[in-house]
Amino acid sequence: MERFILDTSVFTNPDTFNQFARDAVEATRIFLQLARRADAEFFIPGSVYEEFRLMKDLASLGGDFESVVKIRSPRRYSLTIPSEFLYELIHEVRHRIDRGLRIAEEHARMAAQPGTVADQGALITRLRERYRETLRRGIVDSREDIDVLLLAYELDGVLLSADEGLRKWADKVGVKIILPQHLRRVLENLTSCSRPQK
């Protein structure tokens, strides 16, 4: 039986949840119906579940969600991960910090030149967008991301996430991945596989 580890993006990213319904809560309900019948187990770390509950009102689905999806955090204090993963992560973060610094310097020079900046607000907005893109895209950038990654690694599970950085780093440590655009079809296939053959 396959084990699937869920990230909030499955339920909050429109490109992913639109496979099920236009509304995120309705999409979650349909996901749960399919997951309940699938020959699979579903997990979500506690930190990710809390994040999800803050983003979406699950009052009507909380009991259903918790009866289908197991809420379990990774065993952070006993789990062993390859040291190369940590080495690469630190190298990547350092590289991104340096790139972010160059972006900040570029915008500081633009602001210092007389007559080049008509709208300081627009300059700051542009700086924030470029800085955020440089530092966060394609990397695990939160405790919740790490919890999902570690739990998938620990359980030898399949990662379900629309987060490109999380998928990239999961692949580095050998975690199985399903692309988010295939989620509904995979669930339907697992549902049909669990039915007895005639």
Curated annotation (Swiss-Prot):
One GO biological process term is:
tRNA 5'-leader removal
Q: Which Pfam families match?
A: PIN_5
Provide the catalytic activity annotation: Endonucleolytic cleavage of RNA, removing 5'-extranucleotides from tRNA precursor
Task: Could you list this entry's UniProt keywords, alphabetically sorted.
Answer: Endonuclease, Hydrolase, Nuclease, tRNA processing
E.C. code:
3.1.26.5
Free-text function comment from the UniProt entry:
RNA-free RNase P that catalyzes the removal of the 5'-leader sequence from pre-tRNA to produce the mature 5'-terminus.
Under which name does UniProt file this protein? Answer: RNA-free ribonuclease P
Origin organism lineage? Bacteria, Pseudomonadati, Pseudomonadota, Gammaproteobacteria, Chromatiales
